[in-house]
A protein has these predicted regions:
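Sec/Tat signal peptide C-region and signal peptidase I cleavage site
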Residues: 17-23
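Axial heme c-ligation environment in periplasmic c-type cytochrome domains
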Residues: 46-47, 55, 67-92, 96-101
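Processing junctions and N-termini across compartments
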Residues: 16, 28-31, 79
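The canonical Cys-X-X-Cys-His
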Residues: 33-40, 93, 97
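Local sequence-structure signature of Cys/Sec-based thiol-disulfide redox active-site neighborhoods
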Residues: 23-33, 43
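Gly/Gly-Pro-rich "capping" loops immediately C-terminal to redox-active cysteine motifs
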Residues: 39-67
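Bacterial N-terminal signal peptides that target proteins for export
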Residues: 1-8
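Bacterial N-terminal signal peptides
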Residues: 8-16
Length: 102
């Protein structure tokens, strides 16, 4: 019984740590790469936190957003200049931004 409880607790702890890490990674990438445009709306970028600007993008779905992030869109270059970011890194940044814009 103790082993079962310990295993369950360990699993929950690991899952929680992974979620926190993903959020931190998303914010880290946003702060270092995305913020320069998405905080001010430079070059037509939707400002983070602008629910009206983000609503149609969020409604289009994660695949559509990731396509824009990876390939670029309008004035946004591919990967938003984060050429060393993996797709998972970019997804973490996108999720961070959309979570603050709903």
């Amino acid at each position: 019984m103790k082993n079962t409880v310990l295993a369950a607790f360990s699993g929950i702890l690991l899952a929680t740590t992974a979620v926190v890490y993903a959020g931190d990674k998303g914010q880290e990438i946003y702060d270092s790469k995305c913020k320069v445009c998405h905080e001010t709306g430079a070059a037509g970028a939707p400002k983070m936190g602008d629910k009206d600007a983000w609503a149609p993008r969020i409604a289009a779905g994660t695949d559509s957003l990731m396509n824009s992030v990876i390939n670029g869109k309008n004035a946004m270059p591919p990967k938003g200049t984060c050429m060393d970011c993996s797709d998972d890194d970019l997804k973490a940044a996108m999720e961070y931004m959309t979570s603050k814009s709903q």
